[in-house]
Amino acid sequence: MTNIRKTHPLLKIVNDSLVDLPVPSSVSSWWNFGSLLAACLAVQILTGLFLAMHYTSDTATAFNSVTHICRDVNYGWILRYLHANGASMFFICLYIHVGRGLYYGSYMYSETWNIGILLLFAVMATAFMGYVLPWGQMSFWGATVITNLLSAIPYIGTDLVQWIWGGFSVDKATLTRFFAFHFLLPFIIAALVVVHLLFLHETGSSNPTGIPSDPDMVPFHPYHTIKDILGILMMLTALSMLVLFSPDLLGDPDNYIPANPLNTPPHIKPEWYFLFAYAILRSIPNKLGGVLALVLSILILAIIPLLHTSKQRTMMFRPLSQCLFWLLVADLLTLTWIGGQPVEHPYIIIGQAASVLYFMIILLFMPLTSAMENHLLKW
């Protein structure tokens, strides 16, 4: 008799995605981050749901409701810190996932890649709005500064900002709508994840060698289910260590001060995972130019498939491109550091140099190096 998982309409979908899915035998642990991201999303939705039961999205009570969750709700503190630090784990996994896609040429599956870019924007928007909800000083001023960037859009900018704010400043209406969107977006992200997987399973997974792996496949279960479970356990262990030993390590102390529109903090900065983009924004003295650079720093991922000039798909056998890739990683770490520093010498010039280098590596150095490697292959 045929197994029910292969005949039942619903189980068949699960079976084809998680059990009998053929996977290249050479995929390494860098391919684990998709499942880690799914685990992160599940943790965020679950903890967020329970936090939303106790949170109030009103400027008068938002800060106190978060304090109430931490002090009075059973295990509320662990829910709050799991959610806050879970976002950090989410972005660590997300950036490694994108980095793996760049290194191993996964962007050649353009539909999957483009949905991935949409997902990245959606997760960033969700995280930004979530940071506003505790209504501390950095929440309020972060929301004010970042939403104000839209005023750089010619003609409609000012009206657009006031429309988003629901008034003439970040206030009660802003907080309420941000909470509504912050609750809604993760479910949209979950739907996009399904589309992302749908496109991925049309082509099958890429592999470290970059050559077709049709003759050499293994079933997803048990090999990759065990591998993914191990990865998830390691990630949850790291998250637990962070939550239980130093929950405020990645947060800003200013966010423990209730929002005060009359008192501007000396250094307004977003969470660590946005600092690289914030540094690029600040490195351009012109407001509109800065906003364009900020958007392009992520949107540039969309044109990477067009800039692929190499005859080989992955960087596995391309040492010059590997050097450039790790230079890009170092540059992003430099930008992250600069984003957290005050706007003064020498940080300004370092930020500007790192910002120029970021775009130069992607737009110029990588395609040229790939073309040069093609030429060297003829020798």
From Swiss-Prot:
A Pfam family recorded for this sequence: Cytochrom_B_C
CC cofactor: heme b
Subcellular locations according to the entry: Mitochondrion inner membrane
Parts of the chain that traverse the membrane: 33-53, 77-98, 113-133, 178-198, 226-246, 288-308, 320-340, 347-367
Gene Ontology CC terms: mitochondrial inner membrane; respiratory chain complex III
Free-text cofactor note: Binds 2 heme b groups non-covalently.
Residue numbers binding heme b b562: H83, H182
Additional information: Heme 1 (or BL or b562) is low-potential and absorbs at about 562 nm, and heme 2 (or BH or b566) is high-potential and absorbs at about 566 nm.
Quaternary structure and interacting proteins, as annotated: The cytochrome bc1 complex contains 11 subunits: 3 respiratory subunits (MT-CYB, CYC1 and UQCRFS1), 2 core proteins (UQCRC1 and UQCRC2) and 6 low-molecular weight proteins (UQCRH/QCR6, UQCRB/QCR7, UQCRQ/QCR8, UQCR10/QCR9, UQCR11/QCR10 and a cleavage product of UQCRFS1). This cytochrome bc1 complex then forms a dimer.
Protein name in the entry: Cytochrome b
Species: Pteronotus personatus
